Amino acid sequence: MKRVVFHVEAEAELISAAARYETHRSGLGLEFILEVERATRALVSYPKIGHRFSRRLRRVLVRRFPYGLLYRIDADAIRIVAVAHVRRRPGYWRHR
């Protein structure tokens, strides 16, 4: 079973998005984090669950929120390269 590793910038995106949601409603940031955790657990069980997003990346959507986890499957781990809003700044993560 592969482990999930977040790129340092993807982890920062997760924290930033959760903080924004928390300003909208108390507890919503935690709900966002829990949905991201649910998606990462699904990736561990089914690494190819996300649709092919580019030549080397896949994307799985986060339930209830307009975010996707962009990831690649390496020999030793599933690497989350971005926690990206589905409608904002497309492709900003490509250098990762």
Residue ranges and their predicted role:
Residues 1-33:
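Arg/Lys-rich, positively charged N-terminal/basic patches that mediate binding to nucleic acids
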Residues 19, 26, 41, 45-48, ...:
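Generic structural signal for secondary-structure transition and capping sites
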Residues 30, 68, 72-96:
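Enriched for short, Lys/Arg-rich terminal
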Residues 45-78:
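Basic/aromatic recognition patch in beta-strand/loop cores that engages polyanionic ligands
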